């Protein structure tokens, strides 16, 4: 039995579930759909949602489906947040509407169009706070922004996740000045 798959999902107040071809989760932050694989069923009772599987052949997707459903429930009720830091002299970000502009040491500023459902707030031009209700989309947008200027292993300059621990490499030793 999948340990993750057999855990019930608590449904907060204000979250509505509709099971059909897909699991439709609606809440105060929006609406998400989760695909239901073959052999997986949902049972709703006492403010909880349980994921059941028809046989052990469907064990591979049992835990996955439960995790996706739990992320959808949490997303439409509380939402998700991802934070990034920009480190480097002259590196900064600005946002106007749904377009984020990054100055990252290249010869040109880089513009990123934020998808629907992802909001970006910028504190002090170097701290980004991404918020949204779809965990997968939010993580992908954060990864795309980080990929614009990954942290340099020698000076640790670039865009990193807040709290990310980076290993700094040692530079050349022979050519250093006295």
From Swiss-Prot:
Domain of life: Bacteria
GO cellular component annotations of the record: cytosolic large ribosomal subunit
GO MF term (any one): rRNA binding
Keywords: Ribonucleoprotein, Ribosomal protein, RNA-binding, rRNA-binding
InterPro entries, alphabetized: Ribosomal_uL6-like, Ribosomal_uL6-like_a/b-dom_sf, Ribosomal_uL6_a/b-dom, Ribosomal_uL6_bac-type
GO terms, biological process: cytoplasmic translation
Cystines in this chain: none
Family: Belongs to the universal ribosomal protein uL6 family.
NCBIfam families documented for this protein: L6_bact
Quaternary structure (record): Part of the 50S ribosomal subunit.
Function of the protein: This protein binds to the 23S rRNA, and is important in its secondary structure. It is located near the subunit interface in the base of the L7/L12 stalk, and near the tRNA binding site of the peptidyltransferase center.
PANTHER family referenced in this protein's UniProt entry, alphabetically: 60S/50S RIBOSOMAL PROTEIN L6/L9, LARGE RIBOSOMAL SUBUNIT PROTEIN UL6M
Protein name: Large ribosomal subunit protein uL6
